[in-house]
């Protein structure tokens, strides 16, 4: 009987997955997120390997490195050949920044790759070699995963790259100074980021490693949105929650994410300006809980898809601990907004940004009303 029940349960999971358009890759990525969250997205063994690598190659982690440093190591130490022309000749590959051909150790890098992307690509290749990882992906960005091991190894190499580009000790020291400021300004945050990298995503991702470990700020989330103006909808393409809090979270039912989120506003602002980067922040108060988050977001053009925009957001829960570690959270000048998760599940009645009716709440109200009337009838005929 037990195997029958287990099989029925598994079949149910697959039916739910199909209903919500979940793919094999979605399951792999969900498993990876669980692994990251279980470890507070901090992995000491990878951090130590980065320090070991830097020492072995006499790299000064107290200063910003450049792509030439990494290219020299790939070519001279690992026998790589770097080709900057081939990918540009194939229009079908304009969404790729690199392809590695293992048989000849040739790394094809797109000529459209900027220096921060090139450094990340090189750093990942160094990780695969230095950590002796062979079951790996060969394109950046990835096209498909054949196994969970490839998903995990891609994460390990990416973590190594982020830790190499943004060394933990230097970042922690800079963050302590930044958090001691009595007032918050986006200019100060931009300067902090510029001291390490030109890539907002690399910087925000790195914050999710060190904030839980070195500042005990574990109630945080990371979101990445994609947007194409012609389509008009926002796609949540990446998320991470260091603790299992409910909001904000991905929605697989094509509902409309709250337009009051700063991560959506920065994208909208970017589409209306000639700037290459829009940076903004707010304190988001969720209407269905008592939770408040300090959220900072960066929006840029999507480097991998023409005509698309993307935003990265980091949210830190405001509680007694975060208030004790981040001085500027006491400042009332940081704008506050009451937000929901999706329009379909939001009870804010006077929202000017609403783009869809609260049909989930309306359906719930109908069910409650029906249940109440049925109970009254049953009581009447007892």
Place the predicted regions along the sequence by residue.
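Short juxta-domain linker segments that transition from a proline/glycine-rich
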Residues: 1-382
